[in-house]
């Protein structure tokens, strides 16, 4: 019953037993029983009672399941005994703890001086630290600073050693993170009570009674002193807390050294004894990582704000999630987001854990795990993962899918290499590798360029992932059902009947990702060479020309790129193009306006003839509308958006039928979904006006029967108000537009008289059209008039197995974060108003 291993602590090895006997003879330890030893190590030396979350002596004889009850009892009973502390006894116990710590083995590194306060609380590693750590303590393969002492002067490796030592202190404490969190809540409660009592005391002193000042307030309940609180606060610091603090200090040191270097008079040389680590990057920002020797013109206030937000885990992430996840689900719907299974001697992990995809923190340190299941990829919301002090020999490549990881520790394992997929961990702030026989190449990059440089190396040098096959083309029959699949669009065209070929045409819609938006900061998961505009532009050319589509509707095309690249290129392949830039180009100088993106339509000259064209920006067009009203929502939310639409009336040469082709790109921000609905309402209203003008000579022709295509990036889900409006003809009640007033548009429920349907609806839409780490969904569509056109073929999905190996596009095969949509349409024989060319 006295064996500490029964409490979840490692057994005391022969070496430790011999050390204990020597210490007993020297008077450094009390009675040599493991029970007495446990009491000395885990009792609060300040007060005689353990802090919240730490095991007391009575727990040795009780079930380990009583830990939670013991924690609640301590929190409920308060702190009445805090004043009964004996400072002399505290100092003696501190000395005992330090002796135990020095003789108890460890991770092969020295504990820093700041751990003295932690030791006084009892948060020290047990004497019975696993034997394998002692065996490897002097192994230079696991601790490279033993082989290369210069690493001890490297700030990045010093941080590794410091945090490895902090991690080693948690050994022997089951659920250490949960216990530390309980201590934080305990301190917060105590501080709140103190503040409340002080406020009440001041209020009673200030309010006079009928016979002068009121009676003196009763003395507050016994509270821990500031000295005691500071020690408990130090003990409650988790490994993550220490990491944040250390990273902040490193950032401050780097900033101070740069400032001092700038202020140094010209001609003064740096003393030889002073190290200027200007070439040593820190995990601050990609800019600092890649351009460590460049000029730093950042404002100090902005830098501080960036530092504060970069190292936090939940506060800023909640805001980010709300920005990119406009669905009904909320981050706070889940009451807990952390799972602490630390120091429980677990050998295997239940598969059910990986169903908890809401987890942001997972603590598996101090166990006996030999492998981590590939299902870890399901936990894509993880910010913190601690695998330290296990028996892992490798890390799964699937862990690279946890792209939101900020703090990842695997101290003291037997991992020799890192998967290339770790290049996806673009948000990583710290990677704890000390105590592993890691490849020297990776260690060299880590110590020279920090974790960011290591991640970028893995990202940029990842071996090519072959695409098993191109996207297949799905043939659709006259009933709107999939009939057959072809390996390519060209193969499908070869099997197309001659009479059907005369009545059909193909259209491609593609958001090409403007080069001004494809920044390294926004797409950190994309290899730098694959993100370069020269590479992406060449891949876009190959992709677009390979489909040989009759109509090309492109979004996010820069004005200059349209004029100098796409027009000359596509002209050689028989295309004519029309372009319309976003509205802000009108207010800019000619040179700057060339950098503004917009929408364009290219058509094959042997397939189509241009009859007329029109273009609009939604805000400007609505202000000219005869029923325009200056509502508050329009002025504050919609008027400053510069999105546009382009309209072309074309005649299909083989069949003689006419068609309106429209392309647009709606506003992106999910916080303005009501504005997107308004923009679509304006687009459809304008299109109806154009159709009525064209058919004014023929009152019998219904505008529903006029062939219409509307292609583009609508930035809207299938369950959005935009989709409902286009698909059903109106939006009566939808949460995205509730309470918003856009005047006439809102009064008529944004209704229109066209019969439109999504072309991909016949196959249930694609799995996604936009693929990024934080967002993967369908937001691009090709809408067609159901009374005049019929879908006869669709370009299918990207191979799912290939997609599963990435966290987002662009990459070496797909040059945009969107994928192109392609459909074949047939003019229906019921279409009227046709005229042979």
Swiss-Prot record:
Polar residues bias: where?
A: 55-66
EC identifiers of the protein: 3.1.13.4
The record lists the membrane-crossing segments as: none
Q: Which GO terms describe its molecular function?
A: 3'-5'-RNA exonuclease activity; metal ion binding; poly(A)-specific ribonuclease activity; RNA binding
Q: Which cofactor does it need?
A: Mg(2+)
- Residues binding Mg(2+): 556
| Primary localization class, coarse | cytoplasm
The LRR repeats extend over 334-356, 358-379, 381-402, 404-426, 427-447
Phenotype upon changing residue 818 to A = Loss of activity
- Identify the stretch(es) annotated as Disordered: 1-32, 46-66, 81-107, 197-223, 254-281
Keywords, A to Z, come to: Activator, Cytoplasm, Exonuclease, Hydrolase, Leucine-rich repeat, Magnesium, Metal-binding, Nuclease, Nucleus, Phosphoprotein, Repeat, Repressor, RNA-binding, Transcription, Transcription regulation
Q: Which residues carry this modification: Phosphothreonine?
A: 33, 285
GO cellular component, alphabetical, reads: CCR4-NOT core complex; Cdc73/Paf1 complex; cytoplasm; P-body
Where are the Phosphoserine modifications? 278
Q: What is the effect of changing residue 713 to A?
A: Strongly reduces activity
Record localization: Cytoplasm; Nucleus
Question: SUPFAM superfamilies recorded for this chain?
Answer: DNase I-like (SSF56219), L domain-like (SSF52058)
Comp. bias regions, Pro residues? 210-222
**Example GO biological process term?**
DNA replication checkpoint signaling
Misc: Present with 2780 molecules/cell in log phase SD medium.
Function recorded in the entry:
Acts as a catalytic component of the CCR4-NOT core complex, which in the nucleus seems to be a general transcription factor, and in the cytoplasm the major mRNA deadenylase involved in mRNA turnover. CCR4 has 3'-5' RNase activity with a strong preference for polyadenylated substrates and also low exonuclease activity towards single-stranded DNA. Discovered because of its role in the control of ADH2 gene expression. It is required for the expression of genes involved in non-fermentative growth and it mediates or is required for the action of the SPT6 and SPT10 genes.
What does the UniProt entry state concerning the protein's domains?
The 169 C-terminal residues are important for deadenylase activity.
Q: What is this protein called?
A: CCR4-Not complex 3'-5'-exoribonuclease subunit Ccr4
Organism of origin? Saccharomyces cerevisiae (strain ATCC 204508 / S288c) (Baker's yeast)
